[in-house]
Amino acid sequence: MEHLWKDPVERMPEMQRLQGSFYVCAQGGGRWPQVINIWDIGSKGWEGWAKNVDRLNLKRRKAFYGDWWDTAAQWRTGGFDRLCGAAPGSPSTAEIAHQGITGTLFVHQLLTVRPGTPLDYLATVVEQQVPLWGEYGHRATGIYEVLGNQHEVVVVWATSIAGQTGLRAARDAARGLSDEVEGDDRLVAWEQRSAAF
């Protein structure tokens, strides 16, 4: 984990910045152990992306990274990536830092929507889900459309175990599955609204 934060790009101006590295160890859903890295290309848009991709050229890579790349390769066993674009309302890395958004638990949603509707769905997330989940201690740290297809979105939330437990318990109670807490019908209504996409 520590090696990732030593990536030389972290110290170079106008290059991507690591927004977060999340480690799925167990009981989180999906295959584990697994690492999810979120890189922020910065304010230069596609020009910034091009600079970052260009430095990965095989001839330049060794000179740029030195031994860092070889050491990192010891732990890498495969994986996949998704090039994502921040939707309107998604905070930048600088905004996350400025607002002091932190979490002890990060909830990642990789969702499939009808082709052609990702931005409409994400606008609804910003309008409805962000304030609702905010009442349960969840702060959106990434609201992204997947740029390689027309049917996937990624939403990342910073929260705590207590925040996630409270949200899930209120949802279950609203569905009649539990009487531990008071149910929140708005959570079920949000799920029904989001399912329309």
What is the predicted role of each segment?
Residues 24-26, 95-96:
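Catalytic micro-motifs at enzyme active sites that drive phosphoryl/nucleotidyl and oxygen chemistry
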